[in-house]
From Swiss-Prot:
Name the record gives this protein: Acetylglutamate kinase
Keywords, sorted A to Z: Amino-acid biosynthesis, Arginine biosynthesis, ATP-binding, Cytoplasm, Kinase, Nucleotide-binding, Transferase
Disulfide bond entries: none
InterPro entries for the chain: AceGlu_kinase-like_sf, AcgluKinase_fam, ArgB, Asp/Glu/Uridylate_kinase, Glu/AcGlu_kinase
Binding positions for substrate per the UniProt entry: G41, G42, R63, N156
Family from the record: Belongs to the acetylglutamate kinase family. ArgB subfamily.
Organism: Streptococcus sanguinis (strain SK36)
Listed pathway(s): Amino-acid biosynthesis; L-arginine biosynthesis; N(2)-acetyl-L-ornithine from L-glutamate: step 2/4
Site, as annotated: Transition state stabilizer: K8, K215
GO cellular component entries: cytoplasm
Reaction catalysed by this enzyme: N-acetyl-L-glutamate + ATP = N-acetyl-L-glutamyl 5-phosphate + ADP
Length: 245
């Protein structure tokens, strides 16, 4: 869909939207842009796990998720982060709707590797009908990084991968992956642009590592799927632009 911008919010930004963020969204909406928000909630999940004295473990930047962790993750993402984000947007006259009952019908997923990651999913399909219905009504859909498999089991999904899948399925004009750092850093400086052909070497040399790996991988997939622009940064306008080449 032309004029669609998909924004993934993570890190500190997922806990409190800045005035600058709100203003930019308002400007885009006034200019006729349609926006989808996808969010994670790692900080809140970590806090809830810590309170329950449960371990947090990551493999290749992805959170290992036991079945018993799912109620905690669901509480963090749907009950806290998503609800707060939606409320903040609505309070700023940005009409928004948090997907709860429709989420599992919209985000279809399957296990990545149950033995290695547990209840962590990869997106198999995005059913866009309900999202398009909301966008046509000038509403902002707010999606937590969760999905369901064919058996109706809840799966934890990396928010960067989910945002990429949503952007690709809607053929958005832009995907923005917001994080706590200014962009992809090399020698403590932000790289203004990264070509898809440079990515594997940057991972091999350790320039791209940890939680930045799924961001970059999802950015590359999105660019190659036909989405015009993918930006990684700590705001909506500047950072590292991922381009095909």
């Amino acid at each position: 869909m032309k004029d669609v911008i998909v924004i993934k919010i993570g890190g500190v930004a997922a806990q409190k939207l800045s005035d600058k963020f709100i203003k930019q969204m308002q400007e885009w909406i006034a200019a006729g842009k349609k926006i989808v928000v996808v969010h994670g909630g790692g900080l809140v999940i970590n806090q809830l796990m810590k309170e329950r004295q449960l371990p947090t473990r990551k493999v290749k930047g992805l959170r290992v998720t036991a079945k018993s962790d799912l109620p905690i993750i669901e509480q963090a993402l749907l009950g806290q982060v998503g609800r707060t984000l939606t409320q903040e947007l609505n309070d700023s006259d940005i009409e928004s709707l948090q997907l709860v009952s429709h989420l599992g019908k919209t985000v279809l997923a399957d296990f990545i590797d149950k033995d290695l990651y547990g209840y962590v999913g990869q997106v198999t399909a995005i059913q866009t009908a309900y999202l398009e219905q909301l966008l046509d009504a000038d509403m902002v859909p707010v999606l937590a990084s969760l999905g369901e498999n064919a058996a109706g089991e809840l799966l934890n999904i990396n928010a960067d991968y989910l945002a990429a899948a949503v952007a690709s399925s809607l053929q958005a004009e832009k995907l923005i992956l917001m994080t706590d750092i200014e962009g992809v850093l090399e020698d403590k400086k932000v790289l203004p642009q990264l070509l898809t052909s440079q990515i594997s070497k940057k991972i091999q040399t350790g320039v791209i590592k940890g939680g930045m790996i799924p961001k970059i991988e999802s950015a590359v997939q999105t660019v190659l799927s036909g989405v015009g622009q993918v930006l990684i940064g700590d705001n909506l306008l500047t950072g590292t632009l991922i381009a095909e080449g």
